[in-house]
């Protein structure tokens, strides 16, 4: 018998704090990408899957991740803001090792200024693989 998935909006403050702790432990010890968010939410039997994309405001065709629901995106955004994080371009290996890559053309440049400058010119969706790092982190 399949167990019911828990809605993210039904998380208690303690459950959300535990999730954020797991996100942060993953980030500090191994690096954190969108696939890690999915894996942790899956382990907690949360309803996170959907049809939405995470994109940057600079260009809707600059896709960071896809197939999430609105509640999952809100949870991730809350974690990112509350922990003072930013998205940093990475390679696809980080995602492949964790179980999924997007079936989109990949932006492989790590030059953030160039990526942001060209984002609005993308005519079709392109995937920008990212990891989360501290705003102060310069690695």
Question: What do these predicted ranges mean?
Answer:
Residues 63-81, 87-90:
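Short amphipathic alpha-helical interaction segments
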Residues 81, 94-139:
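Short, amphipathic alpha-helical interaction segments positioned at domain boundaries
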Residues 19-22, 40, 75:
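Charge-rich, solvent-exposed alpha-helical interaction surfaces
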Residues 39, 52, 101-104:
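Intrinsically disordered, low-complexity regulatory/linker segments
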Residues 6-35:
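Positively charged, polyanion-binding regions of nucleic-acid-associated proteins
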Residues 2-7, 11, 47, 71, ...:
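Eukaryotic, polar/proline-rich low-complexity intrinsically disordered regions
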Residues 43-70:
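Short, positively charged loop/turn segments that connect secondary-structure elements
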Residues 33-40, 79:
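A short acidic, leucine-rich amphipathic alpha-helix
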